[in-house]
Amino acid sequence: MLLFLLCLYSMVARGDLGSRSSSHAVHHHHSKEGKNASGMDYGNRSTRNARVKVRLHNHNDDSQDGHHHHKVHRSHGGSIKPHNQKHAKLIRNMIGTHENDPENLTHEEKDLANMAAHGNLDALDMLYRNGSITPDVAESVGGSIPGGITEPVVIQPAESSPMEVNEEARVVDTMSPPDYSDPTGVYVSNGVATGRTNEEQAEINVLNRNENPIDDGIAEEAYSSLLSVGHSLPVAKAVADEIKDANVRKMLRTKRAYDISQPPVNPVYIPQAELARATNSKDVVSDTDRQMFMKKVFEEYIRQGAPVERANFEAGQAGFLIDEYNENLASGLSPDAAYEKAMSLVDLNYQHATRAAAIAGGGQVAAQNAADRSLIEETSANEMVKTPSGLRPEVLKKKEEAINSKKLDRAQDLSSYLTKLHIVEPVNRAHQKLSQAAALKDAASMEGLDNPVVQEKILTDVAASSAEDLAKAHENLENVKTQLKPGGRKTNALNFLSKVLTEKAIKDVNQRNEEMQKEAVKAQKEANENSAVKSAEEHLAKAAEQQIINNEGKSVFSKVLESTGDISEAAKAREEAERAMAETLRHQREARKAEVMKMLGPMGMNSSVKEAVEHMATAHAGLNVVGSDLNELNKKYEEEVAHQSNIEELLRETATSNLEVKEVIPPTTSRVGISEGKIKLPLKGFSNEEPKTEEETIVQSRQRNRRNQVRNKVIGTPVESGLNVVEMEDGYMHISEAAKALKINKGKVFYPESAKGIMEKQKLDTSLLEHKFNTGERAGLDKGVGYYEADASGFTLPLPSPLNPVPTSTMTNEEKSLNIGHAFELEIEDGELIQTPWIEFVKDMRPMVNGRMAHEAEVAAASEMKSRVEEEKKAKNLEGITTEVYTNPDGSKFVEVSSPYGVPEIMTMDQAVESLKSVGSSSVGAVSEEAKKQTPEVPLDMAVTNSVKGSEESFVSSVLSTIQKIGNGKALAKRNAFNGKVDGEKAAIVDEYNKELINEHLSPSSTVEARVRNSIISKAESYARSMGISTQSFLNMISQLPDSSIKEMISYNEAPPSARKDVAETHFYNQIASILPDSKTANTGSVTEMIFNNISTVTHEPNTVGGEILEQMTVPNLKTIEQVETKKTPTGTTQVSVSVPNDPGKIQVLGEVKFKGNPTTTPSSGRRPASNQAVAPANVVPGPMVPSSGRNPLKPGARLPANNGPVSNAPAARIPAGQPDHTMRGFSHSFPNNPQAPGIGATPSPAVGYSGKIAR
């Protein structure tokens, strides 16, 4: 115990305990004096008692008067003279740290010791005489001073104690005195035997004498009184401290009396502290010391101004440290080990509390957690006492569950509190203030409109103010971004770590991609080299073989010529010799091939093996060996053996077997309800790539078979089929290729914590994302991990199909869009799957053959002999068709029919029976005799009739009629694929189909955004053709563009260039980029320009974003110099304007003229232009200089003519005088000397359809 208390004291002296477990135990050093909130500081009693072991005093031992104290002369400094034995002993204790030499004490210490020895009793006596303290206080304080004699006091019942002990349990019966003749006997009170001995009762009576608490105000009054009459500060503090110490001792005696008065503990349960006392009692910290220490900690924190919750928590930590220390002693650990282990647990508690306090902005959550845990621990301890030993593990388990439940509740409360404090409330306040500011701006604008005299000035000031606000907001945003960067003045740690981890992940991915690319290049290079080497080896081998043949021919030629002298005979002999040698070499090569085949026989003889054998026999054996021999090539062919084994293993695997089919979606269903489902993101697409290897062919075939098995079914176990899957409570629903979209009535999208930063870098909207901490609701994430959640209720998610194989990354509703490119899961609480009924989708995938022609073909081929053959073939066909029956939970039965070729079909039981009955040799329904009877006009002898004449045209016409009837024009093309000519009948069907498709997407709304969208949709066919995509794909793309983006583009077009940022940095530009289809000809700039053109058409405002200035001319005028500017617009027209240099208010847009390309006609509005219309195109800068922008923002590569020098004031000589340069919409204009030119004659009227503004 002494070692533990010394450790605590050392930590107090260092000031460590406050930073670890109980920093509250230390405050001021003895040389420091401070003041509390009440004007004084009594110091820390444990520190003071450790510094000055006991108050030194001078008291007459012979005196029996406990209230009379002799005054002794006090000498300050010099030697310390002991006055009695106790005084001498305490002086020795005090100078123990000074090498046992009193002279080593400083003057201050000597003075303090003498004042403590003489002043305390004198001061106490003075306070008692002047009535500052009562007799019981003087008795309590005087009894604590060494040598002091306390007089007997009257025994009183114990009263209220500040130790928070139960009032009823604290009342002890003191009316009946104990029997002192039998100390160990049972104490009897009023005839009732108690559980205490007479000795224990006597101790209780002594402890409860005069235990009324002393008011804390008495110590302060005594402190002030002593200072006011001239006592020194150490004396005043010592007396005040003694009064407070006396109060603590009173409370501890009351606690001791209460502990003794309690009944015996149940013998089956021994408290941990009692067990520790029994095993190692000398080191155990007593309950009294524990309570006193906790109270001191609590008071110290209250004195420092800490809240009550914090003080309670720190006091509890101190008690927890002592409890853990005692418990570790009980487990057999040494005092040092027990202390270290206890401190480690306290450290963990502090780390947890520090994290909670840092998050919550204070210690309230930590204090609440501590209070919850203390209450649970207390309840569990009470249950443990009453529970037999065999059932106590259940109590412990119940306690842990309760603690975990409380922790979870606190975490959820904390998450909600933080979300409200740091997200919801700031955003609401900001939006409220923005609304107020907007209202004030509107009011200022109305003032300008209502007062024509100062209208221009007020509106100019309002516009300037808005521009300044925008610039200031942009500057603030840039400053915040700079501060959040690791190199800025301030770094957000969370963003910093997220950025570092994201950059590291991207770096790792790029590195892996580079490595894979290098490996692929290396493999391709090796393959090319191997192929080149192989070709070179075969070429050299054949060259060597030809050399052998040539040498044989030369040898024979020489011999025959030498023997006969006949050149023709020698030449003939040479040809025969060469032919014989070539045949010999061929036989040898065949023999080598047979040898190699025998060696590689177990591998089989696929194409690659045959090729290798041919190569080996040609180039690596026989007389014409080139490169490696057969032995050196064994390793290469071992790899081929392994490759072949891999293929065989793949072939042996079955696609999917023993599937637990729980439900089948009927083939006629177009809408499927979904509840409590979830889909993994991103969505899977469809690939039409051809397999490049044999393994890829096998895997693709297996996946196709697996899709056929699980499509439109709810499966009990997860199966990888390449289809998108909705995971529900009762199984996994595999979405077919016929699906169109998912409509989410109520649902959420979940993102990883790093997604928001990536989306913000990509300029994507993240306003719907809300940060959460996983408290167990996301099974796939660890507890405590952060993630983002977005409400997807009311959104629609388009699904990929074979016609649109690339999955979209955007969900939309009528107003907003939500990018899900970085999400990992979509949760659907209530939704609907919209799809084309599978029975109709199959018809599109496998068009029906014209029934009439099939019927005629069958009748023409009918005969008795062929009928028998047909029956046999029919049986074989039926054997090749597999069927599987499924029963839904509602009892309905469906049959899946899978033929060797084609797409499996699901049909009802009756439909399946009828269909299989009619299966013939060609898998087309055989014609029954009844059918033959009903069509007698069809002759059986096709050879002697002309009924087949014109059948081709009839067949085509019938097919087109059927297509037109069902409205499926997407399967047709207008042009004949063979001659490139447009087929009128097909074109009409396709046009009708596209027209219906467009009408389905038109909106009945009259808002500007809806009108702009309808304008785009009405031209969908031509736009889609220019982008190289289908009309359906184009319409799907436009339907994903939210109204908010169109509204933003309208505002952007109306804003002056100086007040708007670059197009590529806007939200709408990134939104358009996210919805683009997978097309080589579609780019963000062209689509953006197309939308701005339609905005211009609908709003009758010029397109100020994509215009391109073609030329500028400066011409003289009678009054001033006017500048004529010709500007090409994205609509295919040219806009001409006249302006006065350096006077922006004097600009006249004359009109638009046709330029190269097809113009977009602007309809005449028939109304006056609005006051807020742009005065001139955004990039028209008056003055003789060409505008500095010089670039189309939507076409970065297009530049203006490099004419940046000053323009001469001389008339332009490009156009003859008096001749019109262009024919405009309704009027003409010529430069110069045109009597109708601006400034010379009457002011011209705006052109028909003109939508700009004229300003003079």
Swiss-Prot record:
* Name this polypeptide is given: Polar tube protein 3
GO terms for CC?
Answer: polar tube
Q: Which residues form the signal peptide?
A: 1-15
GO biological process terms on file = sporulation resulting in formation of a cellular spore
Coiled-coil region: none
Which stretches of sequence are listed as region Disordered? 18-44, 59-85, 1178-1256
**Originating gene:** PTP3
Q: State its role.
A: Involved in the sporoblast-to-spore polar tube biogenesis. Plays a role in the control of the polar tube extrusion as part of a specific response to ionic stimuli.
Subunit description: Interacts with PTP1 and PTP2.
Q: Where is the composition biased (Basic residues)?
A: 67-76
What coarse category fits the chief subcellular location reported for this protein? other
Q: Which residue positions carry a glycan here?
A: N36, N44, N104, N130, N606, N1094
- Keywords assigned by UniProt, alphabetized: Glycoprotein, Signal, Sporulation
Organism for this UniProt entry: Encephalitozoon cuniculi (strain GB-M1) (Microsporidian parasite)
